[in-house]
């Protein structure tokens, strides 16, 4: 059971990760958004439903095995592969392929996000994450689903802020979408 007070930002990223971990072990996530309601009746109902489902499911999950899959890291053997990056801004994105070419990388910007990006992002990510994260996931999935990029010979690059920005959590969303897609 996860309690959340808002369901956006870090909560949304954590919810997606917890849900995946639990699903890999044959369990379900019960999410209680404590700011969603003034009446606690629905929260009590969810808790009672959780308790009942735990009773009936206890025997089923004893022999459950996890099928954890990971994406390979980019190494020297991948040199020369196409690397796609989401469109960041009209000021920075045009510079990325040229700068990365100087470092020996074959980088291509994805086009700016559109309505289809949003649709793909909603399909492959937690729909409570921030809108920019939905678009980034959608841009990447749209690119691969278009057939223009071979998943066996194309890599995805994404920035990591290492700080408090939610962009630090995009990697886990992208990874999950690629594995599910």
Model-derived segments and their meaning:
Residues 2-181:
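An N-terminal assembly and electron-transfer interface module characteristic of large anaerobic redox
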């Amino acid at each position: 059971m996860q309690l959340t007070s808002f369901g956006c930002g870090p909560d949304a990223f954590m919810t997606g990760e917890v849900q995946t971990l639990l699903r890999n072990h044959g369990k379900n996530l019960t999410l209680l958004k404590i700011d969603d309601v003034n009446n606690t009746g629905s929260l009590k109902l969810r808790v009672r439903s959780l308790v009942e489902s735990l009773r009936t499911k206890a025997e089923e999950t004893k022999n459950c095995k996890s099928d954890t899959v990971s994406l390979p890291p980019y190494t020297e053997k991948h040199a020369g592969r196409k690397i796609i990056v989401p469109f960041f801004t009209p000021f920075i994105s045009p510079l990325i392929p040229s700068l990365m070419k100087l470092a020996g990388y074959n980088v291509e910007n994805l086009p700016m996000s559109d309505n289809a990006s949003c649709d793909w992002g909603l399909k492959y990510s937690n729909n409570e994450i921030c809108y920019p994260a939905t678009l980034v996931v959608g841009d990447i999935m749209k690119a691969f689903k278009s057939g223009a990029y071979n998943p066996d010979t194309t890599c995805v690059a994404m920035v990591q802020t290492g700080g408090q920005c939610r962009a630090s959590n995009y990697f886990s969303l992208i990874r999950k979408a690629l594995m599910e897609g």
